[in-house]
């Protein structure tokens, strides 16, 4: 079966509905949001020190968007407060990865000043809701051994380790309703 494709649709004909919680919404990232996304990346120096060994490059946001641009199964979002103001975080998710019906969170990151405020739990719940409405069955992600805080976060909101990759990377999964 060949599915019609248009703007916002992927190779499977999937267009995600809005991802919006009580306080924050996901806005599809484009060139207009590069500065805000870069500020979010730079606003999480501890994450980059642990995972990359240093701060993000000055063009990290532009590279993130360029990498995602050619992949119709990938979505990058700026996480923006409903009350207004600059982005507080970034969401990078692959649809139908590694197989149909599975989505993979490549990055959920918030400025350090915005961590611990419940935005991560709220954003994940909104993402799960959008995915379920599109027929996804599973949400998956990977966490490196150098990031125990992220591991604890994902476990707190119902994700379970289902496997290991090279270099101590744990794969987590949550079955969606």
Where are these regions (language model features)?
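Conserved beta-strand-loop-alpha-helix junction that forms the acyl-donor binding cleft
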Residues: 115, 141-151, 168-169
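Residues forming the Rossmann-fold NAD(P)(H) cofactor-binding site
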Residues: 121
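Glycine-rich phosphate-binding loop
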Residues: 118
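Conserved acetyl-CoA-binding loop of GNAT-fold acetyltransferases
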Residues: 155-164
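Acetyl-CoA-dependent GNAT
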Residues: 2-115, 124-126, 130, 134, ...
């Amino acid at each position: 079966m060949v599915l019609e494709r248009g703007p916002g649709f992927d190779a499977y004909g999937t267009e995600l509905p809005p991802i919006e919680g009580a306080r924050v919404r996901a806005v599809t990232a484009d060139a207009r949001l590069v500065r805000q996304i870069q500020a979010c990346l730079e606003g999480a120096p501890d994450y980059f020190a642990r995972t990359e060994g240093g701060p993000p490059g000055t063009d990290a946001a532009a590279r993130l968007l360029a990498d995602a641009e050619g992949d119709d199964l990938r979505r990058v979002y700026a996480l923006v407060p409903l009350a207004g103001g600059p982005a507080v975080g970034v969401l990078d998710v692959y649809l139908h990865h590694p197989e149909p019906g599975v989505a993979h969170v490549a990055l959920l990151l918030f400025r350090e000043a915005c961590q611990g405020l419940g935005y991560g739990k709220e954003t994940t719940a909104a993402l799960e809701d959008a995915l379920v409405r599109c027929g996804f069955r599973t949400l998956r992600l990977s966490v490196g051994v150098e990031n125990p805080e992220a591991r604890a976060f994902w476990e707190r909101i119902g994700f379970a380790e289902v496997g290991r990759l090279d270099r101590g990377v744990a794969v987590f999964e949550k079955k969606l309703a």
